[in-house]
Curated annotation (Swiss-Prot):
PANTHER family: 30S RIBOSOMAL PROTEIN S20, SMALL RIBOSOMAL SUBUNIT PROTEIN BS20C
Record-given protein name: Small ribosomal subunit protein bS20
InterPro entries with a match to the protein in the record: Ribosomal_bS20, Ribosomal_bS20_sf
GO molecular function: small ribosomal subunit rRNA binding; structural constituent of ribosome
GO cellular component term of the entry, any: cytosol
Coiled-coil spans in chain: none
One family name in Pfam for this protein: Ribosomal_S20p
Family of the protein in this entry: Belongs to the bacterial ribosomal protein bS20 family.
Lineage: Bacteria, Bacillati, Actinomycetota, Actinomycetes, Mycobacteriales
Taxonomic source organism: Mycolicibacterium gilvum (strain PYR-GCK)
Keywords: Ribonucleoprotein, Ribosomal protein, RNA-binding, rRNA-binding
Length: 86
């Protein structure tokens, strides 16, 4: 444990951020998994709805700094390509 007061505070804030980031990333994985399942089943309408929801989650994660904005863009384009292949 740190002896400096500011570092003790940083440890606490880092832990809170780590837990938030973990939660956001977990929900991203779940959203992407649901989209991929819809694509594999061939349900284009459901996949289209899930693409919008997943893209929104990716954008939110990028704006909060959980993932990089380019990573969000790359994932969104890959999901859109998968939808267009149906």
């Amino acid at each position: 444990m740190a002896n400096i007061k500011s570092q003790q505070k940083r440890i606490l804030t880092n832990e809170r951020r780590r837990l938030r980031n973990k939660s956001v990333k977990s929900s991203l994985h779940t959203a992407v998994r649901g989209f991929r399942e819809a694509v594999e089943s061939g349900d284009k309408e459901k996949a289209g709805e899930l693409l919008l929801a997943t893209s929104r989650k990716l954008d939110k994660a990028a704006s909060k700094g959980v993932i990089h904005k380019n990573q969000a863009a790359n994932r969104k384009s890959a999901l859109a390509r998968a939808l267009n292949k149906i």
